[in-house]
């Protein structure tokens, strides 16, 4: 059976891993997943990530906790294969009044809503993280 939405699967693995207090989660890798993991690491939502394997690369995310609680309070898919959500630069949402981030896929790559606003770019809203 093929996976319909690999990004939603990635977000669910992160959510479930933190609910079970796992140190790390693994998943099949792709360029988009690595780009999302890079944004999550830069923003401090995950500890680290690495890609292992040549024929079937696996992405391993090291989850982050603060005083025993998961750093990621909520992670939510926005744009999905059945309903893509695109926003212009001045329509980009602020997640939790700026405390969270929106991960945006732009023509210049995957970045946060803050970085996209500064660069004057709009794009596809992949997910919200808080």
UniProtKB/Swiss-Prot annotation:
Q: Provide this UniProt record's keywords sorted from A to Z.
A: Ribonucleoprotein, Ribosomal protein, RNA-binding, rRNA-binding
Q: Does the keyword rRNA-binding apply?
A: yes
| Cited InterPro entries | Ribosomal_uS8, Ribosomal_uS8_CS, Ribosomal_uS8_sf
The answer to whether the entry has keyword RNA-binding is yes
Q: Which GO terms describe its molecular function?
A: rRNA binding; structural constituent of ribosome
Entries under SUPFAM superfamilies matching the protein: Ribosomal protein S8
An individual GO BP term: translation
Q: Name one GO cellular component term.
A: ribosome
Kindly give the NCBIfam families that the UniProt entry links to this protein.
Answer: PRK00136.1
List, alphabetically, the HAMAP family matched: Ribosomal_uS8_B
The family this protein is said to belong to:
Belongs to the universal ribosomal protein uS8 family.
What function is annotated for this protein? One of the primary rRNA binding proteins, it binds directly to 16S rRNA central domain where it helps coordinate assembly of the platform of the 30S subunit.
Protein name stated in the entry: Small ribosomal subunit protein uS8
Origin organism is: Klebsiella pneumoniae subsp. pneumoniae (strain ATCC 700721 / MGH 78578)
Q: What is the lineage of its organism?
A: Bacteria, Pseudomonadati, Pseudomonadota, Gammaproteobacteria, Enterobacterales
Which gene is annotated as encoding this protein in its UniProt record? Answer: rpsH
């Amino acid at each position: 059976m093929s996976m319909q939405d690999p990004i939603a699967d990635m977000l669910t693995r992160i959510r479930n891993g933190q609910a079970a207090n796992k140190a790390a989660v693994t998943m099949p890798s792709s360029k988009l997943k690595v780009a999302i993991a890079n944004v999550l690491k830069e923003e401090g939502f995950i500890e680290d990530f690495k890609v292992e394997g040549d024929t079937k690369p696996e992405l391993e995310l090291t989850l982050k906790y603060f005083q025993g609680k998961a750093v990621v309070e909520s992670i939510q898919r926005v744009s999905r294969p059945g309903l893509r959500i695109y926003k212009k630069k001045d329509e980009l949402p602020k997640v939790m009044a700026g405390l969270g981030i929106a991960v945006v896929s732009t023509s210049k790559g995957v970045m946060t809503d803050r970085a996209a606003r500064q660069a004057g770019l709009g794009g596809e809203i992949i997910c919200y993280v808080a």
